[in-house]
């Protein structure tokens, strides 16, 4: 962690030269244990980031060693709920870094289904916060844009003919992506079987164990919004449709809503997922397991189109 500290000291010096007040925010990384309230020892501290005075009472946070972040967008290992802001002199206070930014993924798909089961369309996606940071990291560590697009096409099982980004190299909280794609649905006699989400939130339950002895810790809170507009081919009608879903965790801090509707030859899906709780105790695990099980099953449900 020596390099990180050196860079943040340099950053604070540069901010001071520019007349911008800044302070060290000392902490113990999430992987190294929680900093105790009752007896916070210097020996428990192993890194720090920079707090920049935004107003008289608020700070924004920055880690100068991170190349893909932004103001308040920190590496998850530094997003602790208990850090100490050393404001100056003998002044200091506790700060919570666990939810400093909004981590959002918003995607809109507009596509047309052809009688041979091909789905042609566009996807426009906005990545915010941690999603933008992750997208930039993957894009910039790929050998080139072709490799990145090929990996995306393979992961989503689509053919991509156009790929564009906005903000990929900017110091910005947001990255935008646009793709033109083609995807093959399943055709059997007079029926077309397709997943109406086209691009899934999750294919399977990430929690496979029936019991858990240790807590579940999420890296950050998140929000996912998927909107899909599909045009049904002429001469076809909807034969089977998934049911709507709204499910919450027992404490209400996790939620998923899935709505689907047909109007004329238009099929519309609106999907929202929110997760704001970062730590689930072993006693809460069965409810969390069921929550994700239902979400994964809903993500894999299909629409059946029937030829008239």
Write out the residue ranges for each language-model feature.
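A sensor for short, sequence-defined functional sites
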Residues: 2-308
């Amino acid at each position: 962690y020596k390099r990180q500290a050196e860079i943040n000291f340099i950053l604070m010096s540069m901010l001071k030269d520019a007349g911008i007040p800044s302070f060290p925010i000392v902490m113990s990384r999430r992987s190294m244990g929680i900093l105790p309230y009752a007896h916070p020892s210097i020996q428990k501290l192993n890194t720090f980031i920079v707090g920049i005075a935004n107003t008289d009472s608020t700070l924004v946070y920055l880690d100068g060693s991170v190349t893909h972040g932004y103001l308040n967008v920190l590496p998850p290992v530094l997003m602790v709920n208990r850090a100490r802001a050393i404001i100056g002199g003998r002044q200091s206070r506790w700060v919570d870094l666990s939810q400093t930014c909004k981590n959002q993924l918003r995607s809109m798909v507009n596509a047309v289904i052809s009688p041979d089961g091909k789905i042609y369309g566009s996807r426009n996606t906005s990545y915010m916060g941690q999603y933008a940071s992750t997208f930039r990291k993957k894009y910039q560590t790929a050998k080139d844009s072709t490799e990145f697009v090929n990996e995306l096409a393979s992961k989503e099982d689509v053919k991509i003919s156009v790929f564009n980004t906005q903000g990929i190299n900017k110091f910005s909280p947001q990255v935008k992506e646009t793709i033109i794609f083609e995807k093959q649905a399943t055709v059997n006699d007079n029926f077309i079987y397709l997943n109406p989400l086209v691009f899934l939130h999750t294919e399977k339950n990430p929690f496979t164990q029936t019991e858990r002895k240790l807590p579940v810790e999420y890296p950050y809170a998140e929000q996912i919004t998927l909107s899909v507009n599909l045009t049904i081919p002429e001469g076809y009608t909807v034969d089977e449709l998934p049911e709507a879903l709204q499910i919450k965790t027992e404490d209400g801090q996790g939620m998923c809503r899935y709505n689907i509707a047909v109007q004329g030859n238009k099929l519309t899906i609106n999907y929202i997922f929110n997760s704001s709780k970062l730590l689930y105790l072993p006693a809460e695990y069965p409810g969390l397991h069921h929550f994700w099980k239902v979400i994964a099953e809903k993500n894999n449900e299909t629409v059946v189109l029937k030829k008239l």
